[in-house]
From Swiss-Prot:
One of its GO terms (molecular function) is thyroxine 5'-deiodinase activity. This is Type II iodothyronine deiodinase. It comes from Neoceratodus forsteri. The chain crosses the membrane at residues 8-28. Belongs to the iodothyronine deiodinase family. Predominantly monomer. Can form homodimers but homodimerization is not essential for enzyme activity. Its main location: endoplasmic reticulum. It catalyses: 3,3',5-triiodo-L-thyronine + iodide + A + H(+) = L-thyroxine + AH2; 3,3'-diiodo-L-thyronine + iodide + A + H(+) = 3,3',5'-triiodo-L-thyronine + AH2; 3'-iodo-L-thyronine + iodide + A + H(+) = 3',5'-diiodo-L-thyronine + AH2; 3,3'-diiodothyronamine + iodide + A + H(+) = 3,3',5'-triiodothyronamine + AH2. The lineage of its organism: Eukaryota, Metazoa, Chordata, Craniata, Vertebrata. InterPro entries: Iodothyronine_deiodinase, Iodothyronine_deiodinase_AS, Thioredoxin-like_sf. It is found in: Endoplasmic reticulum membrane. It comes from the Eukaryota.
Length: 269
């Protein structure tokens, strides 16, 4: 099968999912607009905020590119884990250091994997609402399973930058992040996220390089989670935001290590 035929086949596979996402964005905009109109008619002060449409040309390009990233990703369940280049994010150093893409700050994703423990890798950014909403759950996973597994958070390109396809759900000043124009800006954003959510020290934090090589290799786009074991992909989560599921990660860890959380009531008894 020729390259053109493969590209055509992938496009045909993507189209139904792409159009379903467009429909979701159109319905979302309709509901938000209706709510905005009702608030205006009721003279509510909360209606004075800016209404941001999600179904825009930039939004459509972003969604389409996310499906292309997923379709052409290098990572496959049971296959070799891509050893992508990343940059360490350490406390207090991001603002002072100059990131040229070289030097001791740069490392590889599999540097954080050990031979006898699984590595849970969580990809996302501060401007992705589903990723942010699940960070407390991820933090709990780290706290409960750090005795049997290693954890790594990879900060990628912003999903909804303030100067791009901005989302209404990230209007707070804490997460108004613009498009990264340098490695330093990306690391600073990752460091702010690390501080805001007080991630446990057992979870290492790195940032994708500016060529987005990790994002491309793992087909992340918005958010994704996977588990690396013996340099193979033991678990591969679905494409975010709709198939990003940390419950499956918990289930995998529990099934693999027969570990169950003891209910609080039993501890009291």
């Amino acid at each position: 099968m020729g390259l053109l035929s493969v590209d055509l086949l992938i496009t045909l596979q993507i189209l139904p999912w792409f159009f379903s996402n467009c429909l979701f964005l159109a319905l979302y905009d309709s509901v938000v607009l209706l709510k905005h109109v009702i608030l205006l008619l009721s003279c509510s002060k909360s209606s004075r905020g800016e209404w941001r449409r999600m179904l825009t040309s930039e939004g459509l390009r972003t969604v389409w590119n996310s499906f292309l990233l997923d379709a052409y990703k290098q990572v496959k369940l049971g296959g070799d884990a891509p050893n992508s280049k990343v940059v360490r994010v350490t406390s207090g150093c991001c603002r002072r250091r100059s990131f040229s893409g070289k030097g001791e700050s740069e490392c590889h994703l599999l540097d954080f994997a050990s031979s006898n423990r699984p590595l849970v890798v969580n990809f996302g950014s501060a401007t992705u609402p589903p990723f942010i909403s699940q960070l407390p759950t991820f933090r709990k996973l780290v706290e409960e399973f750090s005795d049997v597994a290693d954890f790594l958070l990879v900060y990628i390109d912003e999903a909804h930058p303030a100067d791009g396809w901005a989302a209404p759900g990230v209007a707070t000043k804490s997460f108004e992040v613009k498009k990264h124009r340098s490695q330093e800006e990306r690391c600073v954003a990752a460091h702010k996220l690390l501080e805001h959510f007080s991630l446990p020290p057992q979870c290492q934090v790195v940032a994708d390089c500016m060529d987005n090589n990790t994002n491309v290799a793992y087909g992340v786009s918005f958010e994704r989670v996977c588990i690396v074991q013996r340099q193979k992909i033991a678990y591969l989560g679905g494409k975010g935001p709709f198939f990003y599921n940390l419950k499956e990660v918990r289930h995998w860890l529990e099934q693999t290590y027969r570990k169950r959380u003891v209910p609080t009531c039993e501890l009291i008894m």
